[in-house]
UniProtKB/Swiss-Prot annotation:
The gene is nuoD. One of its GO terms (cellular component) is plasma membrane. Keywords: Cell inner membrane, Cell membrane, Membrane, NAD, Quinone, Translocase, Transport, Ubiquinone. It is a peripheral membrane protein. GO terms for molecular function: NAD binding; NADH:ubiquinone reductase (non-electrogenic) activity; quinone binding. This is NADH-quinone oxidoreductase subunit D.
Length: 400
């Protein structure tokens, strides 16, 4: 935008100026490069440049077996890895025509919700930091550490878990873990109340986020929003309710919905989602029963170590599984899960071989990021920071 000013008999042309926001900026949440066209401090245009974390994940998966492809999903949205694995595991199960055992489904549902809380803890606390509040991020990391210990207990890894598998989960829950999780579910709601008490009615926080980056329900649908971002705009769309998978049909929970579609509502929706996730985890703990944790077809899941020491067939199954992998019948499926950020989908095509013919990943943040021009228009430069924070972007999945 340029304007003409008449000054002392001269006509002076004043042009807007463009600046780079990121990719080195700490509030860019990774490697976002945002070219902002400013009129003074007012954002006239926001042009996101992506691809700085592109690793060719979709193409790499075409050269791996289905089992080898799974760990790539941990590295997409590396803040909520088990939810990404969940989508690929369900898609592969659909093509194979198998269903994970009851116990495995309850474990996966429980850890998907633990992962949701992990994600929201990081987002809400760093989002508050973007707005100038330093205390929540110090509190939040202490709580996240407890949840990462649960990740480590079942998978051996804090972040890149590689725990969900087509047909179930990699290992059973270690002894005593359910008691530790149950103890944590009793204490964690008090932390949510403390954090919400620090921010929800804080006058300074509300000045930063209320009526900033508003999206109407029509705009949210048009831009392909999902997850907390679309629910903050007043649309109660949640795949766990509308298209339940694993054990979500057997648990009771509410879908929090906002009214104004602004940064404040996106914050409130995530706070309430953490409360609902604790509620789901409690129900999972009460309903998990003893049983197998993976399908008993050893052409798909590895046989137990003890059986391999006794049976030649078990040894052959293990060797074939880890050298060649299993062959998936020809077909295609689109399978989506309600990840902490929104709808994370996998379009998986099999040509009957042991490798995916095509694996198209539908990232959540990609749709949200493209709307930033609309959301930041005519807001101040400082508001662009909280808008980015409210979208909960992770560039591992945006760039793939």
């Amino acid at each position: 935008m340029s304007e003409t000013v008449q000054k002392q008999g001269r006509v002076v042309e004043i042009d807007s100026h463009a600046i780079n926001f990121g990719p080195q900026h700490p509030a860019a949440h990774g490697v976002l490069r945002l070219v902002l066209e400013l009129d003074g401090e007012v954002v006239e245009r926001a042009d996101p440049h992506i691809g700085l974390l592109h690793r060719g994940t979709e193409k790499l998966i075409e050269y791996k077996s289905y089992l080898q492809a799974l760990p790539y999903f941990d590295r997409l949205d590396y803040v909520s890895p088990m939810c990404e694995e969940h989508a690929f595991a369900l898609a592969t199960e659909k093509l194979l025509g198998i269903t994970a055992p009851e116990r495995a489904q309850w474990i996966r549902t429980m850890f998907a919700e633990i992962t949701r809380i992990l994600n929201h803890l990081l987002n809400l606390t760093t989002y508050a930091l973007d707005g100038g509040a330093m205390t929540p991020v110090l509190w939040g990391h202490e709580e996240r550490e407890k949840l990462l210990e649960f990740h480590e207990a079942v998978s051996g890894a804090r972040f890149h878990a590689n725990y969900f598998r087509p047909g179930g989960v990699a290992k059973d829950l270690p002894a005593g873990l359910t008691d530790r999780i149950a103890d944590w579910t009793e204490k964690f709601p008090a932390f949510i109340d403390d954090m919400a008490g620090l921010l929800s009615d804080n006058r300074i926080w509300k000045q930063r986020v209320v009526d900033i980056g508003r999206m109407t329900p029509e705009q949210a649908l048009a831009w392909g929003f999902s997850g907390p971002c679309i629910r903050a705009s007043g649309i109660p769309w949640d795949l766990r309710k509308s298209q339940p998978y694993d054990k979500y049909a057997d648990v009771d929970f509410e879908v929090p919905v906002g009214r104004n579609g602004d940064c404040y509502d996106r914050y409130l929706v995530r706070v309430e989602e953490m409360r609902q996730s604790v509620r789901i985890v409690k129900q999972c703990l009460g309903k998990i029963r003893p049983g197998p944790i993976k399908v008993q077809d050893h052409k798909i899941t590895p046989p137990p170590r003890a059986e391999m020491k006794r049976s030649m067939e078990a040894l052959i199954h293990h060797f074939k599984l880890y050298t060649e992998g299993y062959h998936v019948p020809e077909g295609a499926t689109y399978t989506a899960v309600e990840s902490p950020k929104g709808e994370f989908g996998v379009y998986l095509v099999s040509d009957g071989s042991n490798r995916p013919y095509r694996c198209k990943i539908r990232p959540t943040g990609f749709a949200h990021l493209q709307a930033i021009d609309v959301m930041a228009h005519r807001h101040m430069l400082a508001d662009a920071v909280v808008i980015i924070g409210s979208l909960d972007l992770v560039f591992g999945e945006v760039d793939r």
